[in-house]
Amino acid sequence: MIGFLLLFFLTSSPAASTVVQCLGSQSMAKTVVMLLLAFALAGCTQLVTDVATVKDPGRYEVSLPGSGVTLGGILFRPASTLKLLPAIIVLHGWARPGVPGALRVEGTARLLSEQGYVALALSMRGWPPSSGWDDCGTQQPDDVAKAADWLATLPGVNADSIGVLGFSLGGQVALLSGSRSDRIKAIVAYFPITDVQRWKETTSNTGIRHFYVPLVCGNGYWNSPVHIAEQIHAPVLLIHGDRDTEVPTEQSLKMQEALRRADRHVELLIIGGGDHGFKGEQDEQAWSAATRFFNIYMKPGE
């Protein structure tokens, strides 16, 4: 908490100018911020920011505890408000090792922040700056549960209104996290993997079929949201393109069926002509549905 308040003081106006006056120079003020960042990289789990972020108010690079790992991400906070705000964790899809995961969904988190959400673009375990290894949804959902707990402690966050949005592998993890945390009140999953073994059999991606699933996912039964649908209590929106061959559309169709059998609330949006990713009007249609869904379940009465 102290770290957050200090960083807010250093990165806010007119507070920033006051710091400069006290320290004697802009460079000295930046040095203080860099020292805070270095402390964070040494293991601090409080809110931190770097010098580049000073030019982008409301954007913070963060480090937080996961389930036995340290997670990194980018947090966006809307302009100051007197009311508590809902928060959304944004999860990326699979990426080449070494690619910072949070950067892939930073733009999505920023857009959510502009709509009044505290938004955390999270690097899942296996992608920097988070530690650990990609595990195809084994412990990654526990990390998301820990991230939800962390968000709930931040000033200005409504601890009773936390959601998750994920893409592809991130969609799989978002769904699984709904069975690991009671804090999660809404889930939006873009073209998620929901049945790992069926995915292996039907994907057009030979790397997934011959390497990723056998080496990373294993049997994949408990990594498959379709098998634990009754444990997911949050409302779910599934979004999938009807021409997706990497994660075939049937993955969302089967998830919809499983959630309905479990008497859970689920909505499914099929994007005509959509592949494993959307463009132009497809993207607008999907985004409109996602934000509408979050607004209904996380901003009731507004």
Language-model-derived ranges and their functions:
Residues 47-82:
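N-terminal cap/lid segment of alpha/beta-hydrolase-fold proteins
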Residues 82-85, 93-131:
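Short substrate-entry loop that stabilizes the transition state in hydrolases
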Residues 100, 192-228, 234:
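Mobile cap/lid helix-loop segments that gate and shape the active-site cleft of serine hydrolases
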Residues 135-155:
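Alpha/beta-hydrolase active-site loop
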Residues 157-168:
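Alpha/beta-hydrolase fold nucleophile elbow
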Residues 171-182:
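Short glycine-enriched nucleophile-adjacent loop
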Residues 232, 238-240, 244:
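Short beta-strand/loop motif that positions the catalytic acidic residue
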Residues 253, 261-302:
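C-terminal catalytic histidine-bearing segment of alpha/beta-hydrolase fold enzymes
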